[in-house]
């Protein structure tokens, strides 16, 4: 009787044992990750690789990744990875930054995989992290409370002087404008413009430094023999980074004269060569208007230098006459997405034309002469006329050709 009872219990227990068996348990037991890694090819790519196996065919693999950057809402990117389905698979995907744009050195990227088999079992792997480092150089580092300098050529004194220049620029921005770093900054010092451009994706030939505000990182080219320029360049890029962090999440952009003027202010006194250009332009009443340099600077090198000098002068005019609190208020209004004119009207009571008139008056000048020097349209009147004539001739040629074809 006892034997019969035991057999009956085993009979009814079999379905339960079947349900609890490894072959039918949670998805984690259905799909196994053999390996997962990522390899950086700085500065152009990162390749993510996965090997996995399952009791049934693996049908779908997605990769999700998220660079460590400042954002209003953490957002990850998801990629449907191509691979050959099977019970044991190898999958890989390369993030081609020549297509998407690059990342600064030192950026950390979190990534994880989502795997599904043909039976519908799914797993998500735990997050891994890859650091996107430039391994071409043997980096040293030196830091303060807010800034860390990374460099590979030059002695410790070289790095100390650059670090001091960065700290002084931050103090200047805090005292004169009222803006400060939202998070510590990393500054990578490349010893030449060639080395710097080799660390960037599609750099401009004239690029001397770049501030990656969302990543709180600056990359810049400074040789030990060009320390004076390097100090100014670091201060300038820090100015951009701090201001952009201040208006982070804005719906619009800053006028170029304000963005560059604040960065120039971070450097300290205006460079003597730029001051000379500004003085000459004032003497000949040959200044660009505020509106002219609001959207972009001229491409001509000398006109661009004058635009930088004017931007510095404009920011100094606003600070000297209205105080740093108003500059900070102006940045706050721009953060809300206000237009250039509306922001100035809200904070100061005048628009760009009004600012232009008051600034010129402070320099001893009358109303803005027209036209302003070196129009920034980039195309002179004779070329515009030539383009119009060519366009008209082209239209006439097409018209007569079609008319002739209809007669045929």
Each model region followed by its residue ranges:
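Short, hydrophobic alpha-helical membrane anchors of single-pass surface/secreted proteins
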Residues: 379-392
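Ser/Thr-rich, Proline-interspersed low-complexity disordered segments
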Residues: 14-27, 146, 364-379
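Glycan-association/targeting regions that enable binding to alpha-glucans and other polysaccharides
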Residues: 23-139, 148
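C-terminal membrane-anchoring or membrane-association module
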Residues: 390-408
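Bacterial N-terminal signal peptides that target proteins for export
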Residues: 1-8
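Short, solvent-exposed loop/turn and secondary-structure capping segments
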Residues: 61, 124-126, 161, 198-202, ...
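Acidic/His/Gly-enriched intrinsically disordered linker/tail segments
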Residues: 206-217, 222, 228-233, 245-379
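Juxtacatalytic substrate-recognition/specificity segment
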Residues: 138-251, 255, 297, 307, ...
């Amino acid at each position: 009787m006892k034997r019969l009872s035991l057999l009956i219990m085993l009979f009814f227990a079999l379905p339960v044992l079947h349900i609890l068996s490894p072959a039918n348990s949670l998805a984690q037991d259905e799909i196994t990750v053999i390996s997962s890694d990522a390899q950086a090819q700085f500065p152009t790519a990162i390749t993510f690789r996965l090997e996995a196996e399952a009791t049934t065919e693996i049908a779908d693999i997605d990769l999700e990744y998220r660079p460590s950057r400042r954002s209003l809402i953490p957002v990850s990117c998801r990629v449907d990875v191509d691979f050959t389905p099977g019970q044991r698979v190898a999958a890989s995907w390369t993030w081609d930054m020549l297509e998407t744009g690059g990342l600064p050195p030192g950026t950390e990227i979190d990534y994880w995989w989502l795997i599904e088999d043909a039976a519908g079992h799914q797993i998500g792997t735990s997050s891994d992290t890859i650091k996107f480092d430039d391994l071409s150089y043997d980096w040293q580092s030196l830091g303060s409370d807010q800034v860390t300098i990374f460099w590979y050529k030059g002695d410790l004194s070289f790095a100390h002087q650059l670090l001091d220049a960065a700290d002084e620029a931050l103090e200047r921005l805090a005292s004169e404008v009222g803006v400060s770093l939202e998070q510590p900054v990393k500054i990578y010092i490349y010893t030449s413009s060639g080395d710097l451009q080799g660390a960037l994706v599609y750099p401009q030939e004239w690029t001397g430094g770049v501030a990656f505000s969302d990543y709180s990182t600056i990359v810049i080219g400074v040789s030990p023999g060009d320390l004076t320029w390097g100090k100014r360049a670091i201060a300038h890029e820090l100015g951009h980074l701090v201001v952009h962090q201040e208006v982070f999440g804005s719906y619009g952009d800053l006028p170029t004269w304000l963005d560059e003027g604040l960065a120039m202010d971070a450097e300290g006194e205006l460079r003597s060569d730029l001051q000379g250009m500004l003085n000459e332009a004032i003497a000949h009443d040959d200044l660009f208007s505020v509106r002219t340099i609001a959207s972009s600077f001229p491409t001509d090198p000398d006109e661009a230098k004058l635009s930088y000098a004017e931007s510095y002068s404009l920011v100094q005019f606003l600070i000297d006459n209205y105080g740093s609190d108003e500059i900070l208020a102006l940045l706050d209004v721009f953060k809300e997405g206000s237009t250039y004119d509306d922001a100035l009207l809200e904070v100061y009571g005048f628009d760009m034309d009004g600012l232009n008139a008051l600034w010129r008056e402070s320099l001893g000048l009358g109303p803005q002469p027209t036209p302003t020097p070196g129009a920034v349209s980039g195309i002179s009147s004779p070329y515009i006329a030539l383009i119009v004539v060519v366009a008209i001739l082209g239209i006439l040629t097409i018209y007569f050709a079609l008319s002739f074809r209809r007669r045929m």
